[in-house]
């Protein structure tokens, strides 16, 4: 992967196990990284579904792409608090100015009070069958979901309000500097 610079803008492409595009986002602005995550932000960005439908995100989001684990985390800064949408997904790659990963259906929704809900189990079972997920993949995905739940329960990075707000402030600063140029 090429070395990213603060403020670099990339697209995001989410694929399914069969290689077909699932969803794409027009914008992700590089904020920085640490040992565990590469961090991006966006706000009111255009999203295109596999069937061609489009919509825009409603609020700012800080996205954490894990360098070591099979998940990515989207922190949504809503008026009612910070919500997290966590995708169980393959490790990401960056090619042609695009973040790419395979979405494996299972999602974890985390609410501002720290409670959470596992989403899309039925979709996971359906795709596991028709796309022939291997036993190894199935085991990895279930293990990664457990790890993710433990991160939520322990308030590990990035499930920390202070940290996501700092990342958001940095995102706003980067966007303002880009406008000045």
What are these regions (language model features)?
Residues 1-60:
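Charge-rich, low-complexity N-terminal segments
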Residues 15-17, 33, 45, 68, ...:
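Generic structural motif
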Residues 22-26, 57-59, 68-72, 101-105:
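Short, surface-exposed coil-to-beta transition loops
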Residues 49-94:
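The feature represents the first ordered module of a protein
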Residues 79-135:
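Conserved, surface-exposed functional patches that form binding/active-site neighborhoods
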Residues 118, 127-154:
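A contiguous, mid-protein "functional segment" used to position or interact
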Residues 145-181:
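Cysteine/selenocysteine-centered motifs that mediate thiol-based redox chemistry or coordinate metal-sulfur cofactors
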């Amino acid at each position: 992967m090429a070395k990213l610079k603060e403020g670099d803008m990339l697209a995001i492409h989410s694929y399914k196990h069969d290689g077909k595009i699932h969803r794409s986002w027009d914008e992700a602005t590089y904020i920085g990284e640490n040992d565990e995550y590469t961090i991006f932000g966006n706000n009111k960005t255009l999203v295109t579904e596999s069937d061609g439908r489009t919509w825009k995100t409603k609020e700012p989001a800080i996205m954490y792409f894990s360098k070591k684990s099979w998940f990515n985390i989207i922190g949504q800064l809503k008026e009612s608090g910070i919500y997290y949408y966590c995708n169980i997904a393959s490790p990401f790659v960056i090619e042609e100015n695009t973040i790419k990963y395979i979405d494996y259906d299972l999602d974890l929704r985390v609410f501002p009070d720290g409670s959470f809900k596992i989403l899309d189990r039925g979709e996971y079972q359906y795709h596991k069958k028709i796309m022939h997920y291997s036993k190894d993949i199935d085991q990895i995905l279930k293990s990664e979901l457990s790890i993710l739940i433990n991160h939520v329960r322990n308030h590990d990075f990035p499930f920390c309000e202070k940290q996501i707000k700092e990342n958001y402030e940095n995102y706003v600063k980067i966007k303002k500097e880009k406008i000045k140029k």
